[in-house]
Amino acid sequence: SSLTMMPMSLEEIAQAVQGRLIAGTAAVNTPVATSAFTDSRQIVEGSVFVAIAGERVDGHDYVPHVGAQGAVAAIVDHEIADAGVPQIVVEDTVLALGALAKHNIERRRALGTPFTVVGITGSVGKTTTKDLMKALLSHMGPTVAPVGSFNNEIGLPLTSLKVNAETRFLVAEMGANHVGEIANLTSLVPPDIAVVLKVGVAHLGEFGSAERIAQAKSEIIHGLVPGGLSVLNANDEHVA
């Protein structure tokens, strides 16, 4: 389906996230993973469940239940006793999610068929622009874009893990709530085209000045693939 990633073996995933694969008794032949989720309710046949400890909910609590939904593995930061699925143990599951997404995009690029990543950042208008881009690009080929405003170190990888061999365009919304965040996101998913919208004062508290914000936004341009294209807002003194 359109929501699947590039198919990967558990060994390949463990290598991509630099994790330790604990097969346990659950390893029957070599299951192939075709999707990855952090929300246990979205798990389907062939999914990898990435357990993330949030403020209210710890994904590790759900690891024993995802096997019944068809999960082929769980990525965890500690071994779960009654997991029922193979586990890939890593130090940080959020970083592992990013590493898996990065590997998925590299796998897609390695096919050599046309594939373009459009990265969008700015304080104002990201989601509207993303929705317009998706509407336009969908006429030209299968397009993956975030649902809602998935633009952080969890949302961007989850969106990127919906890219597969059929995908022609990935619209990647990149939030910038602190200096270095966009550089981190572009290291996971280097854009071919970077769009920098208005740099507003929405996040001045954390950044300190419009110049600092502009610097953060410029990280998306430095994160471009070689020969990439940047689209700037000529009306914004902090961008152009």
Could you tell me what each predicted segment is?
Residues 1-5:
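Short, Lys/Arg-enriched N-terminal segments with co-localized hydrophobic residues
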Residues 96-234, 238:
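Phosphate-binding loop of NTP-binding sites
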Residues 8, 67, 169, 239-240:
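Bulky hydrophobic/aromatic packing residues
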Residues 7-119, 128-139, 154, 161:
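Short, basic phosphate-binding NTP loop
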